[in-house]
Amino acid sequence: MFPKFKFPFLKKSFKQKVLATTELTTTFSYQERPEYTRIIAGAGWKYHWTNKNNMTRHVLDLVDLNYVYLPKSRSNFLDSISNPLLRYSYEDHFILRAGYVYYHTNKLPSNGYRQRFQSDFYTFRAGVETAGNFLYGMSKLFGQKKRDDGSYRVFDINYSQYIKGEIDYTYTHRFSPRHMVAFHSGFGIGIPYGNSTILPFEKRFYAGGANGVRGWSVRTLGPGAFRGNNSVTNFINQCGDIRLDFNMEYRAKLFWVLELGAFIDAGNIWTIKEYDNQPDGVFKFDKFYKQIALAYGLGLRFDFTYFLIRLDLGMKAHNPAKGEEPWPIFHPNWSRDSAIHFSVGYPF
């Protein structure tokens, strides 16, 4: 990381008004599952800049390249994925993308008396990324022939092409230094096009988990009214192209580092088109509101100033999955309707 812009043509006056860094990154991820082994290697060049009070921040991913490689998979793993669109997410592919993230808050800096008693503050985050356009343009320019499935390849490897956007807004009201309530709403959508017919698995949205609808474990909710019934491929099918989240959380400081949280979560994910392995998962304006999952729960937090440890217990209130009890809030079953989450930091 360089403590200034490594970018030509920028005026000196602009560089003096902002706090900026240039970041060169390399990443390596190794994932071992019973069904497959996956390796993701990447490199990127990005810029960060913020105003002097750190209330507005920008991140520009100028270029980010990831290579997803599956050296081995269980013999029946890909065979169990009958939908060829989902199979694509578990084959070797490139992701060459660019993106931009904007972040703004009116929350005052933490050093000072005013911050401790600021009654209302908000944060807003919006991001967009796109992938595959440069490679697709080069394929067209040099007259590369498409494969039988209608896609281009680079070094005989597929590359993804899509656009994806996300917006999140959080508002917090303090009743006193020890009591507050926080509201969060979020929306995201990803659309494949050109060289892709589906988003790569690592770019699709998922629901449930410590930062989602906490009545469900991660990747066990949605899309839509879809109900998973195959333990081998559930984690593949329970992801989507659209996400919608609403959360409300009351937070109270008890004593020492201990805090209490009470929350209500709502949301789900959907696909933008019909997939054979995700029935009832597509987003429809006349149905999506009926497929919004609801959860409630309590949590304990340990605030050590520099980091916070969180333990939440969530319970299902409304389950949109077909064939399940639709309103478990009236007939709760602990083993069926509860989920425990351990995480670091607030959910929003």
Identify what each model region corresponds to.
Residues 1, 58-252, 262-285:
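C-terminal outer-membrane beta-barrel translocator/porin domains of Gram-negative envelope proteins
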